[in-house]
């Protein structure tokens, strides 16, 4: 998939807060990337022993609470100065199904909206706002209380459907869409639980392994992309 977007100049954004483990996926990925822009600028592309070269740079812009600036503002400045042809934005996500926690790697070509998964909406980073294509790569590392209750409710509905006396009730509940059931649960739970997010107990090791998996995949696709030719 990424191979179809490959260009001569790419920039990786390690989005997230390095100090908060579930949100440190992006910075960890940036740590393991084989960046080469500085070498190419100093010695030329032949220093990398190949003409089929993608110039790769990486940045960890931090979060607004650390910098006082919108991440999108920082990125726009970087795009203006370095003029990449493609932005790869890696960020942690909030799951809408607990089974997806630390298990799925999502890729989209529609950009990324930092903080939207936890209700902390920041400026979007898309092709329209930055002027270059933005590939979003993310892994769900947290889940909110409403999702946990909703997953439990799914098991409850299944149990109702298996009961002769309560089957009709289960079928009625099953007729609602996943989004409708989620919103229904969100309205029912206690207000103080709406801002509660949960992460698995092994999140430290999971984030390290996932970040290494993503970074190695990007290194192969971007640095050694000629193996796909």
Labelled PLM ranges:
Residues 3-10:
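Short, small-residue-biased leader/transition segments that mark boundaries at the very start
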Residues 14-23, 65, 92-97:
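Gly/Ser/Thr-rich loops at beta-strand to alpha-helix junctions
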Residues 17-54, 58:
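Glycine-rich phosphate/diphosphate-binding loop of Rossmann-like nucleotide-binding domains
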Residues 24, 28, 70-74, 82, ...:
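Conserved active-site and cofactor/substrate-binding residues in soluble primary-metabolism enzymes
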Residues 46-49, 75-79, 122-127:
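A generic local secondary-structure boundary/capping motif
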Residues 49-78:
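A structural-propensity feature for long, helix-poor, extended segments
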Residues 59-60, 89-229:
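A structural signal for small-residue-enriched, beta-sheet-centric alpha/beta enzyme cores
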Residues 79, 84-85:
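Proline-aspartate-enriched helix->loop->beta-strand connector
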